Curated annotation (Swiss-Prot):
GO terms for molecular function: chromatin binding; DNA binding; histone binding. This is DEK domain-containing chromatin-associated protein 1. It comes from the Eukaryota. Residues 402-416, 431-435 bind DNA. Found in a mRNA splicing-dependent exon junction complex (EJC). Binds specifically histones H3 and H4. Its main location: nucleus. Residues 33-46, 267-276, 441-462 have a biased composition (Acidic residues). The gene is DEK1.
Length: 462
């Protein structure tokens, strides 16, 4: 049975095997033909044959290379915006023919307000180069009779959209007289529109001529001022030097008064004779130093005049020389003040017994000066303090103040602030009061030391 079935099936198997072999052979032939065709074929790029690389069939399928297509935009022709603007003659005069408007336009630079004005006038934007030229050629809106109302309404809307400051700027450029503080925005828009419909000169005064006149006046005044300053400079500097000398002279006079009072008080005492000699020597020294300072200032003034005439040195060097001379004179007078105050303090500290008698005799002298002080106080409307009041306040100030840093001017300021009166004219009297107060304070300290020593001795005895 098995042999019979095999014999029956063999013709069918043979038929199927033959069909499969034919299919494989046809496939191989087709692939070989394709490979040969691809090798022979070439892609033409720019007139040249380019053979694509051949890869074996077993690895990957073959792909045809595609040609790159570039996307190019056709540029349209340039718009007509670069064409010159056609300006037709309006109802009024051209803005460049109105002198004030032309003058203001010449002073202005292209800015946002001018660009906005150009768009309102012509409905188009303009380049910065042609901006002022186009505005100057404007002579009024050109509207047809049929569309006049519509065009006027459009122009009014454009002006209403602008800020008040811009409308004021338009009025300034177009020389429209306006009260900036009280005018309203609506009124500004109406005035600008009326002017632009028919531009005309608003006033007869020419701004260019008025500004030229003002410039001429300024130049003439500046020349006069410079000439006046050049002629009066030495006189001014002399005045300044004199002013600097005045306070030093007053200080010297105060010191001389102190010296004279000291001499009058010491007539009845034999011990005070050397004080008089010292005070006289101090006065002579101060006078000599004043004379030297005056001679220095005079010499500096002569040098300045000679330098001005010859024009050898600049003004800066002159000012330096003035400042140097003034500073030197101030330093010299300050040194004199310090030396006099220190010497007077030492002399009066050594002579404690005579200080009490001086206090009695000096009370009579301020009464003579009191008449002058009362005259000044009557003019000012305030009563000046007496010597006793000054003495009390000075002692309080001296207890609070450091002797190393405090000066006479500081004490005078504190006294003035306390009494509400300027006491610079009583400088010499205040100086005497200060010395008396210092002596009293030193006496009190000595008495305290003696009391403490006595108490210590008593305790030691006990």
């Amino acid at each position: 049975m098995a042999t019979e079935t095999l014999e029956l099936k063999t013709p069918q198997l043979a038929d199927t095997v033959a069909v499969t072999e034919k299919d494989t052979e046809t496939k191989k032939k087709d692939e070989v033909e394709k490979d040969e065709a691809m090798e022979e074929k070439g892609e033409e790029i720019d007139g040249e044959k380019v053979k694509s690389p051949v890869t074996p069939v077993s690895e990957r399928p073959i792909r045809e290379r595609k040609r790159t297509g570039r996307y190019v935009i056709d540029t349209p022709p340039r718009s007509s915006g670069n064409k010159p603007l056609s300006i037709t003659q309006g109802r009024g005069t051209r803005l460049k023919e109105i002198p004030n408007v032309a003058y203001k336009l010449s002073k202005r630079k292209p800015d946002d307000n001018l660009f906005l004005l150009h768009t309102i006038l012509y409905g188009k934007k303009a380049k910065a180069q042609m901006l002022k030229k186009n505005i100057g050629q404007f002579s009024g809106f050109v509207w047809s009779e049929q569309e006049e109302e519509k065009q006027r309404a459009k122009a009014k809307e454009k002006l209403d959209k602008c800020i008040k400051e811009k409308l004021i700027d338009f009025c300034d450029v177009l020389d429209i007289p306006v009260n900036k503080s009280t005018v309203k925005k609506e009124e500004l828009a109406v005035r600008v529109l009326e002017f632009l419909v028919c531009p005309k000169a608003t006033r007869d005064i020419l701004l260019a001529d008025s500004e030229k006149e003002t410039k001429k006046r300024k130049k003439s005044t500046s020349k006069n001022v410079t000439s006046g300053e050049s002629s009066h400079v030495p006189a001014k500097r002399r005045r300044q030097a004199k002013k600097q000398e005045q306070p030093t002279e007053t200080e010297g006079n105060g010191e001389s008064d102190v010296g004279s009072e000291g001499t009058n008080d010491s007539n009845g005492e034999d011990d005070v004779a050397p004080e008089e000699e010292n005070n006289k020597s101090e006065d002579t020294e101060t006078e000599d130093e004043k004379d030297k300072a005056k001679e220095k200032t005079k010499s500096t003034d002569k040098k300045r005049l000679s330098k001005r005439t010859k024009k050898e040195k600049p003004a800066a060097e002159e000012e330096k020389s003035i400042k140097g001379s003034a500073k030197s004179s101030r330093k010299s007078f300050r040194q004199v003040d310090k030396s006099t105050t220190s010497s007077s303090k030492k002399q009066k500290v050594d002579k404690d017994d005579s200080s009490k008698e001086k206090g009695k005799t000096q009370t009579s002298k301020p009464q003579a000066k009191g008449s002058k002080d009362q005259g000044q106080s009557r003019k000012k409307g305030k009563k000046e303090p007496t010597r006793k009041e000054l003495h009390v306040v000075v002692t309080k100030i001296l207890k609070e103040v450091d002797f190393n840093t405090a000066t006479l001017s500081d004490i005078l300021r504190k006294l003035g602030s306390h009494f509400g009166i300027d006491l610079m004219h009583r400088k010499a009297e205040v100086k005497d009061i200060i010395t008396d107060a210092i002596n009293e304070m030193s006496d009190d300290d000595d008495e305290k030391e003696e009391d403490t020593e006595d108490e210590g001795e008593k305790e030691g005895k006990d």
